[in-house]
Amino acid sequence: MPYELKKVFASLPQMERGVAKILAGDPKGNNFLYTNGKSVIIRNIDNPAIADIYTEHAHQAVVARYAPSGFYIASGDTSGKLRIWDTTQKEHLLKYEYQPFAGKIKDIAWTEDSKRIAVVGEGREKFASVFLWDTGSSVGEITGNIKVINSVDIKQTRPYRLVTGSDDNCCAFLEGPPFKFKFTMSDHSRFVNCVRFSPDGSKLASAGADGQIFLYDGKTGEKVCSLGGSKAHDGGIYAVSWSPDGTQLLSASGDKTTKIWDVAANSAVTTFNLGSDVLDQQLGCLWQKDYLLSVSLSGYINYLDKNNPARPLRVIKGHNKSIQCMTVNNSDGRSTIYTGSHDGHINYWDAETGENDTFTGKGHTNQVSSMDLDGCNQLITCSMDDTLRYTSLISKDYSSSESVKMDVQPKCVAVGSGGYVVTVCIGQIVLLKDKKKVFAIDSLDYEPEAVAIHKGSGTVAVGGADGKVHLYSIQGNSLKDEGKTLPAKGAVTDLAYSHDGAFLAVTDANKVVTVFSVADGYSEKNSYYGHHAKALSVAWSPDNEHFASSGMDMMVYVWTLSDPDTRIKMPDAHRLHHVSSLAWLDEHTLATVSHDACVKQWTVTFK
């Protein structure tokens, strides 16, 4: 293969305030599961930089769970589709697909022999279904709740018991198979968010929005006690997870804490305070082997440290909203990837290890649309919050003084030499020097969309929605129209100069990439055809002979300058999502980002 996937830096879980997030464990103890958008993410628990992404759902995926055998995963989405797929092959072949009810699936449970599945959620006619995994034949009827069911679990030892937790403040207890309703447990005074049997099946825990955790006998359903007396947490409890030996319980709450409970002593052994911001609310947890994980409303996954509750062992960060732009900094022999997302977050990633963090302080408040680096260790970004920001790559801290307010919304930014920056806004081109606006062109007869600056000559190329590239030159503190336009094949979406400044590549809405030769007075060198939909982004390889383009057709092409017919086609680089930005780490490594909030690296080999 001329290309192969080298690394995946996965997205964080997609979070919603007041809604529990299920982190599902792996019976073999190696991985954990969660969902974001239409994707199911499988991450290695020892090294979270190792990730695999399943993207076959047509609607937003909500929950995924391993079968106890470890060979299959069942995942459910907002439309009520349940897909059961293989975990042993990279292709993740579909085994079975069912539609237990029409509506969002909120939780899934398997019997220990991996033969029966219970599915619960927000159905229209019914809220739950339990059936054989291979035929879909019913193995009972789940009744006893009159509102949306949030959680389900099946005792992993015989005789089987099934329990559900619902918005009607009740848990329903069923025996089977075939599963039949026995009684309701109505101890909670608010919604029941989570129900879980202990690994040996002897105990059952239920957690609710009333801040209480009740323990029951796993076989009979008799109430044993209320953990912590009247209240286990000051806020609603969204998840509980048992220790492997069943003696302790981990709970996650909206009061921004997680707790470890000694079940026999009925007391909290450890309390983890995870912050004071609303984004620090804890909406999910998982206890797997020696690892204790919790997930915050921000999407961050915390590895909790029993020996030091005040500070997590590590926090997995990243994006959980679509990534809009990216740039790469190669210095000191290391590559750092900078990414900006739809919610205003900017992250920096070590390209080798995947270690990443976000800039500190108060930054952009809306989508980061474009970014570029200057030679002074600064990242220049423009955003839909109508600002342009200069952020130090050394301090990695936003500073209020480094923000420049624009008159109208900026779309794209380019950095030249000598402290010059050009940004194109709606109906306006602005020149900045040393972090100050020095010149603007307002009376344009076209709508500017993209900009690039020739580092050597200072020529500014502005791509317009009129299907032309307009050339300007920086003269002192002003921009002079050169009176020259270059014809693209459609409305320009992106443009980039090669690193040696010899060529200008232009992508357009008519699916074409056009390359102009700078030395020959910007004469057209070649046109490159292949995209089936609007081309979006273009990036030059450091060898100046190859360049990559991405489009709305979800394709990435790597083109050869001297031969338009020699191309490498990369379909489904980010399946179901178009690639929003590209950048080369070196001559053979291409990085891509997309609306799936993931960063991928590809090894590209040329003949």
Curated annotation (Swiss-Prot):
Database matches in SMART domains: WD40
Residue intervals passing through the bilayer: none
Predominant place of localization: membrane
A Pfam family the protein falls into: WD40
Annotated keywords: Actin-binding, Cell membrane, Cytoplasm, Cytoskeleton, Membrane, Nucleus, Repeat, WD repeat
Family: Belongs to the WD repeat AIP1 family.
GO CC field: actin filament; cortical actin cytoskeleton; cytoplasm; nucleus; plasma membrane
Compartments where found: Cell membrane; Cytoplasm, Cytoskeleton; Nucleus
The protein's name in its UniProt record: WD repeat-containing protein 1-A
Species per Swiss-Prot/TrEMBL record: Xenopus laevis (African clawed frog)
